[in-house]
Amino acid sequence: MENISLYVCSYNVEKTIEEVIIGILNLDPKPNEIIIVNDGSTKKNNLVFKKMSHLKKIEVLNLRKNVKAQIAIATGLNFLKKEKFQGGIIVMDADGQDDPEYLIDIFKESKKNPERTITINRTKRDDELPFKILYQMYLFLSFLLTFKYLKFGVYSYLHSSSLDKILSTNDIHLAYAASLAKHFKNKNVIFAPRKKRILGESQNNYKSLTHYALKIISVFRNQVLINSIVLVFISFLLSKLITSSALFLFILLALLFFNVIIFLLAYQINKSHVVNDTLKNIENIENLRNELL
Protein backbone atom coordinates (compact mmCIF):
# COMPACT_ATOMS: atom_id res chain seq x y z
CA MET A 1 0.00 0.00 0.00
CA GLU A 2 1.18 3.52 -0.81
CA ASN A 3 2.44 5.74 2.00
CA ILE A 4 -0.69 7.02 3.79
CA SER A 5 -0.80 9.83 6.35
CA LEU A 6 -3.94 10.01 8.49
CA TYR A 7 -4.68 13.51 9.72
CA VAL A 8 -7.12 13.92 12.64
CA CYS A 9 -8.39 17.29 13.88
CA SER A 10 -9.29 17.53 17.59
CA TYR A 11 -10.38 20.03 20.24
CA ASN A 12 -11.06 18.99 23.84
CA VAL A 13 -11.98 15.43 22.80
CA GLU A 14 -9.30 13.29 24.43
CA LYS A 15 -11.68 10.42 25.21
CA THR A 16 -13.21 10.34 21.75
CA ILE A 17 -9.91 10.67 19.90
CA GLU A 18 -8.53 7.81 21.98
CA GLU A 19 -11.39 5.57 20.83
CA VAL A 20 -11.04 6.72 17.23
CA ILE A 21 -7.28 6.07 17.12
CA ILE A 22 -7.65 2.67 18.83
CA GLY A 23 -10.21 1.76 16.17
CA ILE A 24 -7.75 2.82 13.48
CA LEU A 25 -4.89 0.81 15.00
CA ASN A 26 -7.09 -2.30 14.93
CA LEU A 27 -7.62 -2.02 11.17
CA ASP A 28 -5.84 -4.07 8.54
CA PRO A 29 -4.38 -2.48 6.48
CA LYS A 30 -3.47 0.59 8.52
CA PRO A 31 -2.11 4.06 7.72
CA ASN A 32 1.66 4.51 7.89
CA GLU A 33 1.51 7.54 10.15
CA ILE A 34 -1.04 9.48 12.17
CA ILE A 35 -0.97 13.23 12.74
CA ILE A 36 -3.30 14.67 15.38
CA VAL A 37 -3.85 18.42 15.26
CA ASN A 38 -4.69 19.62 18.76
CA ASP A 39 -6.59 22.81 18.00
CA GLY A 40 -5.66 24.73 21.14
CA SER A 41 -7.43 22.37 23.54
CA THR A 42 -7.88 23.70 27.07
CA LYS A 43 -7.79 20.15 28.42
CA LYS A 44 -4.42 18.41 28.58
CA ASN A 45 -4.01 15.36 26.35
CA ASN A 46 -2.48 12.25 27.90
CA LEU A 47 -2.70 9.94 24.93
CA VAL A 48 -0.99 6.54 25.03
CA PHE A 49 -1.55 3.90 22.37
CA LYS A 50 -0.50 0.30 21.89
CA LYS A 51 -0.16 -1.69 18.64
CA MET A 52 2.01 1.03 17.13
CA SER A 53 4.83 -1.13 15.77
CA HIS A 54 3.72 -0.66 12.14
CA LEU A 55 3.61 3.14 12.36
CA LYS A 56 6.45 5.34 11.20
CA LYS A 57 5.24 7.99 13.61
CA ILE A 58 2.28 9.34 15.49
CA GLU A 59 2.56 13.06 16.11
CA VAL A 60 0.49 15.70 17.85
CA LEU A 61 0.67 19.23 16.46
CA ASN A 62 -0.24 21.44 19.43
CA LEU A 63 -1.63 24.78 18.26
CA ARG A 64 -1.13 27.88 20.39
CA LYS A 65 -4.72 28.99 20.08
CA ASN A 66 -7.99 27.53 18.88
CA VAL A 67 -8.61 28.49 15.25
CA LYS A 68 -11.60 26.19 14.53
CA ALA A 69 -11.63 23.11 12.34
CA GLN A 70 -11.18 24.62 8.87
CA ILE A 71 -8.02 26.60 9.68
CA ALA A 72 -6.72 23.70 11.78
CA ILE A 73 -7.09 21.43 8.74
CA ALA A 74 -5.21 23.95 6.60
CA THR A 75 -2.47 24.04 9.25
CA GLY A 76 -2.03 20.28 9.08
CA LEU A 77 -1.91 20.25 5.29
CA ASN A 78 0.61 23.11 5.27
CA PHE A 79 2.70 21.11 7.74
CA LEU A 80 2.67 18.05 5.45
CA LYS A 81 3.64 20.26 2.52
CA LYS A 82 6.51 21.78 4.49
CA GLU A 83 7.69 18.29 5.49
CA LYS A 84 7.61 17.33 1.78
CA PHE A 85 5.34 14.39 2.52
CA GLN A 86 4.78 12.12 -0.47
CA GLY A 87 1.71 9.89 -0.61
CA GLY A 88 -1.96 9.83 0.29
CA ILE A 89 -3.56 12.00 2.98
CA ILE A 90 -6.77 11.13 4.81
CA VAL A 91 -8.52 13.89 6.75
CA MET A 92 -11.07 13.07 9.45
CA ASP A 93 -12.62 14.57 12.58
CA ALA A 94 -11.99 13.21 16.07
CA ASP A 95 -15.55 13.29 17.42
CA GLY A 96 -16.33 9.76 16.23
CA GLN A 97 -18.84 10.76 13.54
CA ASP A 98 -16.34 9.83 10.82
CA ASP A 99 -16.37 6.02 10.98
CA PRO A 100 -12.78 4.64 10.97
CA GLU A 101 -14.04 1.37 9.46
CA TYR A 102 -14.48 3.15 6.13
CA LEU A 103 -10.73 3.74 6.02
CA ILE A 104 -10.52 0.23 4.54
CA ASP A 105 -12.72 1.38 1.63
CA ILE A 106 -10.57 4.49 1.21
CA PHE A 107 -7.41 2.37 1.08
CA LYS A 108 -8.95 0.10 -1.58
CA GLU A 109 -10.29 2.99 -3.65
CA SER A 110 -7.01 4.93 -3.49
CA LYS A 111 -5.10 1.95 -4.92
CA LYS A 112 -7.01 2.33 -8.20
CA ASN A 113 -5.76 5.88 -8.70
CA PRO A 114 -3.63 7.25 -5.83
CA GLU A 115 -3.80 10.83 -7.11
CA ARG A 116 -7.61 10.95 -7.37
CA THR A 117 -9.42 12.78 -4.55
CA ILE A 118 -12.00 10.74 -2.61
CA THR A 119 -14.92 12.12 -0.60
CA ILE A 120 -17.05 10.28 1.96
CA ASN A 121 -20.64 11.27 1.16
CA ARG A 122 -23.16 10.92 3.95
CA THR A 123 -26.15 8.67 3.35
CA LYS A 124 -27.90 9.13 6.70
CA ARG A 125 -27.93 11.73 9.47
CA ASP A 126 -29.36 11.23 12.95
CA ASP A 127 -30.62 14.78 13.42
CA GLU A 128 -33.79 16.39 14.72
CA LEU A 129 -36.56 17.06 12.19
CA PRO A 130 -36.15 20.89 12.18
CA PHE A 131 -32.45 20.50 11.43
CA LYS A 132 -33.14 17.97 8.65
CA ILE A 133 -35.57 20.40 7.02
CA LEU A 134 -33.12 23.30 7.25
CA TYR A 135 -30.31 21.07 5.95
CA GLN A 136 -32.33 20.13 2.86
CA MET A 137 -33.16 23.81 2.31
CA TYR A 138 -29.44 24.61 2.54
CA LEU A 139 -28.58 21.86 0.02
CA PHE A 140 -31.18 23.21 -2.41
CA LEU A 141 -30.07 26.84 -1.99
CA SER A 142 -26.38 26.00 -2.32
CA PHE A 143 -27.05 23.94 -5.47
CA LEU A 144 -29.16 26.74 -6.96
CA LEU A 145 -26.41 29.29 -6.38
CA THR A 146 -23.27 27.20 -6.91
CA PHE A 147 -24.33 24.17 -9.00
CA LYS A 148 -22.62 22.04 -6.34
CA TYR A 149 -24.41 19.39 -4.28
CA LEU A 150 -22.24 19.11 -1.18
CA LYS A 151 -23.12 16.05 0.88
CA PHE A 152 -19.67 15.42 2.31
CA GLY A 153 -17.68 16.90 5.15
CA VAL A 154 -14.01 16.82 6.09
CA TYR A 155 -13.74 13.00 5.91
CA SER A 156 -11.81 12.64 2.67
CA TYR A 157 -8.66 11.54 0.87
CA LEU A 158 -6.32 13.58 -1.29
CA HIS A 159 -2.83 13.03 -2.62
CA SER A 160 0.22 15.08 -1.70
CA SER A 161 0.43 16.15 -5.36
CA SER A 162 -2.84 18.04 -4.76
CA LEU A 163 -1.53 20.13 -1.84
CA ASP A 164 -0.27 23.01 -3.97
CA LYS A 165 -3.66 23.30 -5.65
CA ILE A 166 -5.86 23.23 -2.56
CA LEU A 167 -3.52 25.55 -0.64
CA SER A 168 -3.19 28.01 -3.54
CA THR A 169 -6.06 30.16 -2.22
CA ASN A 170 -7.56 30.97 1.18
CA ASP A 171 -10.75 29.07 0.31
CA ILE A 172 -9.64 26.16 2.49
CA HIS A 173 -9.77 28.44 5.54
CA LEU A 174 -13.44 29.12 4.83
CA ALA A 175 -14.51 25.52 4.26
CA TYR A 176 -12.26 22.56 3.51
CA ALA A 177 -15.02 20.42 1.93
CA ALA A 178 -16.16 23.24 -0.34
CA SER A 179 -12.55 23.86 -1.34
CA LEU A 180 -12.26 20.20 -2.38
CA ALA A 181 -15.42 20.53 -4.47
CA LYS A 182 -14.14 23.72 -6.10
CA HIS A 183 -10.61 22.65 -6.93
CA PHE A 184 -11.14 18.99 -7.83
CA LYS A 185 -13.87 18.35 -10.38
CA ASN A 186 -13.20 14.63 -10.77
CA LYS A 187 -13.55 12.80 -7.48
CA ASN A 188 -14.29 9.26 -6.40
CA VAL A 189 -17.12 8.85 -3.89
CA ILE A 190 -17.65 6.44 -1.01
CA PHE A 191 -21.08 6.45 0.64
CA ALA A 192 -21.27 6.07 4.42
CA PRO A 193 -23.71 6.99 7.21
CA ARG A 194 -22.73 9.69 9.65
CA LYS A 195 -22.23 8.12 13.08
CA LYS A 196 -23.26 9.64 16.39
CA ARG A 197 -20.68 11.46 18.48
CA ILE A 198 -18.89 9.10 20.86
CA LEU A 199 -19.28 11.42 23.84
CA GLY A 200 -21.22 14.60 24.55
CA GLU A 201 -23.28 16.82 22.33
CA SER A 202 -22.13 19.00 19.48
CA GLN A 203 -21.38 22.55 20.59
CA ASN A 204 -22.66 23.84 17.27
CA ASN A 205 -25.99 25.67 17.31
CA TYR A 206 -28.18 26.97 14.51
CA LYS A 207 -26.29 30.26 14.49
CA SER A 208 -22.86 28.65 14.11
CA LEU A 209 -24.16 26.16 11.53
CA THR A 210 -25.70 29.00 9.50
CA HIS A 211 -22.39 30.86 9.65
CA TYR A 212 -20.57 27.74 8.43
CA ALA A 213 -23.10 27.24 5.62
CA LEU A 214 -22.46 30.81 4.47
CA LYS A 215 -18.71 30.18 4.52
CA ILE A 216 -19.20 27.07 2.39
CA ILE A 217 -21.17 29.04 -0.20
CA SER A 218 -18.66 31.92 -0.06
CA VAL A 219 -16.00 29.59 -1.47
CA PHE A 220 -18.01 29.76 -4.72
CA ARG A 221 -18.72 33.50 -4.42
CA ASN A 222 -17.82 34.32 -8.04
CA GLN A 223 -20.17 31.62 -9.35
CA VAL A 224 -22.84 32.78 -6.90
CA LEU A 225 -22.54 36.34 -8.24
CA ILE A 226 -22.99 35.15 -11.83
CA ASN A 227 -25.96 32.95 -10.93
CA SER A 228 -27.48 35.79 -8.91
CA ILE A 229 -27.36 38.09 -11.93
CA VAL A 230 -29.10 35.42 -14.01
CA LEU A 231 -31.78 34.95 -11.33
CA VAL A 232 -32.36 38.69 -11.10
CA PHE A 233 -32.76 38.87 -14.88
CA ILE A 234 -35.26 35.96 -14.85
CA SER A 235 -37.23 37.58 -12.03
CA PHE A 236 -37.28 40.84 -14.00
CA LEU A 237 -38.83 39.05 -16.99
CA LEU A 238 -41.36 37.33 -14.73
CA SER A 239 -42.31 40.63 -13.12
CA LYS A 240 -43.12 41.97 -16.59
CA LEU A 241 -45.36 38.99 -17.32
CA ILE A 242 -47.34 39.28 -14.10
CA THR A 243 -47.19 43.10 -14.14
CA SER A 244 -45.83 43.27 -10.61
CA SER A 245 -42.44 44.54 -9.51
CA ALA A 246 -42.66 43.14 -5.96
CA LEU A 247 -41.13 39.77 -6.91
CA PHE A 248 -38.28 41.42 -8.79
CA LEU A 249 -37.49 43.83 -5.95
CA PHE A 250 -37.58 41.08 -3.34
CA ILE A 251 -35.21 38.79 -5.27
CA LEU A 252 -32.94 41.71 -6.17
CA LEU A 253 -32.57 42.89 -2.56
CA ALA A 254 -32.29 39.37 -1.14
CA LEU A 255 -29.53 38.35 -3.57
CA LEU A 256 -27.74 41.68 -3.17
CA PHE A 257 -27.70 41.26 0.61
CA PHE A 258 -26.63 37.61 0.30
CA ASN A 259 -23.73 38.40 -2.04
CA VAL A 260 -22.51 41.20 0.22
CA ILE A 261 -22.46 38.78 3.15
CA ILE A 262 -20.47 36.03 1.42
CA PHE A 263 -17.97 38.45 -0.12
CA LEU A 264 -17.44 40.05 3.31
CA LEU A 265 -16.79 36.61 4.83
CA ALA A 266 -14.16 35.90 2.19
CA TYR A 267 -12.62 39.35 2.69
CA GLN A 268 -12.36 38.81 6.46
CA ILE A 269 -10.58 35.49 5.96
CA ASN A 270 -8.19 36.92 3.37
CA LYS A 271 -7.25 39.78 5.70
CA SER A 272 -6.94 37.64 8.82
CA HIS A 273 -3.41 37.44 10.21
CA VAL A 274 -4.13 33.87 11.38
CA VAL A 275 -4.29 32.46 7.85
CA ASN A 276 -1.26 34.31 6.50
CA ASP A 277 1.09 31.76 8.02
CA THR A 278 -0.77 29.00 9.83
CA LEU A 279 2.46 27.20 10.71
CA LYS A 280 3.35 29.98 13.17
CA ASN A 281 0.41 28.84 15.28
CA ILE A 282 2.09 25.47 15.95
CA GLU A 283 3.44 25.70 19.49
CA ASN A 284 5.19 22.33 19.58
CA ILE A 285 5.11 18.83 18.12
CA GLU A 286 4.82 15.73 20.31
CA ASN A 287 6.02 12.39 18.99
CA LEU A 288 3.93 9.80 20.84
CA ARG A 289 5.78 6.93 19.25
CA ASN A 290 9.11 8.09 20.66
CA GLU A 291 7.56 8.36 24.13
CA LEU A 292 6.85 4.64 24.07
CA LEU A 293 10.33 3.55 22.92
What spans do the regions from the language model cover?
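Catalytic donor/gating beta->alpha subdomain of glycosyltransferases that bind UDP-sugars
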Residues: 164-223
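N-proximal low-complexity "stem/linker" segments adjacent to membrane-targeting elements
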Residues: 1-23
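A conserved acidic beta->alpha catalytic loop
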Residues: 38-47, 96-97
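Short, acidic, metal-binding catalytic loop of nucleotide-sugar glycosyltransferases
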Residues: 22-31
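Acceptor/aglycone-binding surface of glycosyltransferases and processive sugar-polymer synthases
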Residues: 64-65, 70-79, 91, 97-174, ...
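Short beta-strand/loop segment that forms part of the nucleotide-sugar
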Residues: 31-41, 61-62
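Conserved short acidic donor-positioning loop in nucleotide-sugar-dependent glycosyltransferases
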Residues: 12, 39-41, 67
